[in-house]
């Protein structure tokens, strides 16, 4: 396979009947100047398949300007692509950026393991820098600690205008790296709606964050608000102009959630 072959363009974690989610270009090989190929792909994220067999996949991930290391969205797009090209087991290992992450196929969607999520309460905290009313505040961690705040309703969630300095201030005050705002319910029968912010991580708002959704799953578990029948949760991420839909699989735990997997659909849009 040569570098001249065009990539397959996928839209990952997009809601039904929507142009949201993340655009990812998937290259079936990893030959030549990968940075130049990513720059010419016309997508904000490109993933290259270095190696694949029935039980493992090795990937490299690039933005148009630099190698990214790892990306859940990139992995989901690559797995969806490879599923159409070769035979994969329902559980595989994904190698990227020096990490190995288990993935599983569940109900036609690939999910990546985020691990166990622990939740702690937050002592008295000045949230005035955020400029919104809150119903509950916790810290949840799935490898990285995030401040997780419940707001009044979907209107308040969608009306929130993020201020990088204000969010960074409450993150520093709590020793967290990101902020998740959420409220129950959502479009297309989602059980919860949320937004994810991370000025201390180098971005203001992320439109589709698997790790931060996993933290939210942990908070709902600690509150006893997770579904008790299917052990699955649908989340509507509500970044203005770029909605996303994520699926989580979990095992309930007293102080959060165990064995959390997060993913969603990846749809090929071209060629």
Label every PLM stretch briefly.
Residues 1-70, 75-271:
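Active-site proximal loop and beta-alpha junction motif in alpha/beta enzyme cores
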């Amino acid at each position: 396979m040569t570098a001249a072959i065009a990539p397959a363009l996928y839209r990952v974690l997009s809601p039904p009947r929507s142009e949201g989610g993340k655009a990812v270009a998937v290259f079936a090989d990893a030959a030549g100047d990968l940075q130049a190929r990513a720059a010419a792909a016309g997508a904000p994220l490109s993933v290259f398949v270095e190696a694949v067999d029935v039980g493992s996949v090795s990937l490299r991930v690039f933005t148009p300007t630099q190698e990214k290391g790892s990306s859940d969205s990139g992995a989901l797009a690559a797995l969806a692509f490879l599923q159409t090209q070769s035979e994969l087991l329902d559980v595989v290992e994904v190698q990227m950026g020096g990490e190995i992450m288990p993935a599983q196929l569940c109900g036609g969607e690939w999910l990546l393991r985020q691990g166990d999520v622990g939740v702690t309460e937050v002592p008295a905290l000045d949230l005035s820098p955020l400029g919104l009313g809150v119903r509950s505040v916790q810290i949840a961690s799935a490898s990285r600690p995030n401040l997780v705040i419940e707001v009044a309703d979907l209107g308040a969630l969608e009306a929130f205008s993020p201020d990088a300095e204000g969010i960074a201030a409450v993150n520093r005050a709590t020793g967290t790296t990101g902020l998740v705002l959420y409220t129950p319910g959502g479009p297309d029968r989602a059980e919860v709606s949320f937004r994810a912010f991370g000025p201390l991580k180098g971005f203001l708002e992320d439109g589709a964050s698997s790790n931060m959704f996993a933290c939210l799953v942990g908070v709902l578990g600690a509150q006893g608000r997770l579904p008790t029948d299917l052990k699955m949760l649908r989340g509507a991420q509500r970044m203005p102009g770029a909605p996303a839909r994520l699926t989580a699989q979990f095992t309930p735990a007293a102080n959060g959630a165990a064995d959390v997997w997060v993913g969603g659909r990846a749809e090929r849009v071209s060629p």
